From Swiss-Prot:
It is an enzyme of class 3 (hydrolase). It is a single-pass type II membrane protein. Its EC number is 3.2.1.18. Intact N-terminus is essential for virion morphogenesis. Possesses two apical sorting signals, one in the ectodomain, which is likely to be a glycan, and the other in the transmembrane domain. The transmembrane domain also plays a role in lipid raft association. Residues 68-446 are annotated as: Head of neuraminidase. Inhibited by the neuraminidase inhibitors zanamivir (Relenza) and oseltamivir (Tamiflu). These drugs interfere with the release of progeny virus from infected cells and are effective against all influenza strains. Resistance to neuraminidase inhibitors is quite rare. Disulfide bonds join 69-394, 101-106, 160-207, 209-214, 255-268, 257-266, 295-314, 398-424. Transmembrane segments: none annotated. Residues 13-65 are annotated as: Hypervariable stalk region. Its main location: virion. The active site is at 128 (proton donor/acceptor), 383 (nucleophile). This is Neuraminidase. Coiled coil: none annotated.
């Protein structure tokens, strides 16, 4: 090793950065400190690694103020293959999956049944509400294995990230007196009991936070008649305001919400009167609410009439096969609307997406373009919902489709569970395909 000895007086300028933590998880901006020293150096000519500390990035509330991305359709993004993997591994029994992202990464959520599939406890898991159900959370694309985190106790849920921490809304308890727990940054901050004593429930997809205020739609009351829907405004887990539903929507459940700065917009399920989907507009600043229905005459719920006879006047439920339904989504694109729905008009089979020209602005619009098949009509689908991803220049809309397997339709087995497939908006070109669950029911544990 060569050694060079240098004896001299020099002035060194070191740019050091201090990163002092303050209360409430705030981070002091890094400030340079100039240090001057007179030194004598012995320099060893060898390989040297110099490491510098990088200050943590200042966490900020999300505001979602960028424009919506212009898209031509949707491209495949993720598929977890949970049911296929359950044939030979310990995978949770789940339903009601959804996706939500923090500023750096996307996660998949689902309501577990307190059991894996190859387990006798999986018998009769067709039931929605039991005390053993918990909200599961994994990085998107990671199936719900035994090491999966159970975020909270819940048979109905919603989750969203405000830019600083996760908020989870978790409903559990008796049908006639359930409790909603509000968990922020891993801590229980607030709670609310049932207000109509008839299955308090929430979105089964992501809530939305703008400038630190998160909003979630909750319903308590009849699933096939008049119910009491309220919109909650939450700051760091604390309920700060509750607004009643107003406008012309008659029945609102299982909303799929997205940021439409400075407001939040939701597309929901009318389980009483309409196969056209209700819209709920939420003003974050003044807590005001308005509602109506998607104008497209190609309606989004299941069951529904055939496309020739289906209708929507933008304001009222269409009174066409309104009783029963399925969670779904749509989003506005100028005067047009992008939407997804089952291919079957009668059952949760197949899945398609398309754009309806003037479907957001003109009653009974039926001009369809850019149709894509996500799941072919011979395979089962289920719930679907929206989530938003902020990129450098715009906000992209993505959706997931629940792929239900087992009971009631597949009576060889005693369980009911699901996997998930996810697509995101693209401005590029795309091909064709079908992405069903893919499990051979004869290979599965009974």
């Amino acid at each position: 090793m060569q050694i060079a000895i240098l004896v001299t007086t020099v002035t060194l300028h070191f740019n050091q950065y201090e990163c002092d933590s303050l209360a409430d998880n705030q981070v002091m901006p890094c400030e340079p400190i100039i240090i001057e020293r007179n030194i004598t150096e012995i320099i060893y000519l060898t390989n040297t690694t110099i490491e510098k500390e990088i200050c943590p990035k200042l966490m900020e509330y999300r505001n979602w103020s960028r424009p919506q991305c212009k898209i031509t359709g949707f491209a495949p993004f993720s598929k977890d293959n949970s049911i296929r993997l359950s044939a030979g591994g310990d995978i949770w029994v789940t339903r009601e999956p959804y996706v939500s992202c923090d500023p750096g990464k996307c996660y998949q959520f689902a309501l577990g049944q307190g059991t894996t599939l190859d387990n006798k406890h999986s018998n009769d898991t067709i039931h929605d509400r039991i005390p053993h159900r918990t909200l599961l959370m994994n990085e998107l694309g990671v199936p719900f294995h035994l090491g999966t985190r159970q975020v909270c106790i819940a048979w109905s849920s919603s989750s969203c990230h405000d830019g600083k921490a996760w908020l989870h809304v978790c409903v559990t308890g008796d049908d006639k007196n359930a409790t909603a727990s509000f968990i922020y940054d891993g801590r229980l901050v607030d709670s609310m009991g049932s207000w109509s004593q008839n299955i308090l429930r929430t979105q089964e997809s992501e809530c939305v936070c703008i400038n630190g205020t998160c909003t979630v739609v909750m319903t308590d009351g009849s699933a096939s008649g008049r119910a009491d829907t309220r919109i909650l405004f939450i700051e760091e887990g604390k309920i700060v305001h509750i607004s009643p539903l107003s406008g012309s929507a008659q029945h609102v459940e299982e909303c799929s919400c997205y940021p439409r700065y400075p407001s939040v917009r939701c597309i929901c399920r009318d389980n009483w009167k309409g196969s056209n989907r209700p819209i709920v507009d939420i003003n974050i600043k003044d807590y005001s609410i308005d509602s109506r229905y998607v104008c497209s005459g190609l309606v989004g719920d299941t069951p529904r009439n055939n496309d020739r006879s289906s209708s929507s006047d933008c304001k009222n439920p269409n009174n066409d096969k309104g009783n029963h339904g399925v969670k779904g989504w749509a989003f506005d694109d100028g005067n047009d609307v992008w939407m997804g729905r089952t291919i079957s008009k009668d059952s949760r089979s197949g899945y398609e997406t398309f754009k309806v020209i003037d479907g957001w602005s003109t009653p009974n619009s039926k001009s369809q373009i850019n149709r894509q098949v996500i799941v072919d009509r011979d395979n089962r689908s289920g719930y679907s919902g929206i989530f938003s991803v902020e990129s450098k220049g715009c906000i992209n809309r993505c959706f997931y489709v629940e792929l239900i397997r087992g009971r009631k339709q597949e009576t060889r087995v005693w369980w009911t569970s699901s996997s998930i497939v996810v697509f995101c908006g693209t401005s590029g070109t795309y091909g064709k395909g079908s992405w069903p669950d893919g499990a051979n029911i004869n290979f599965m544990p009974i």
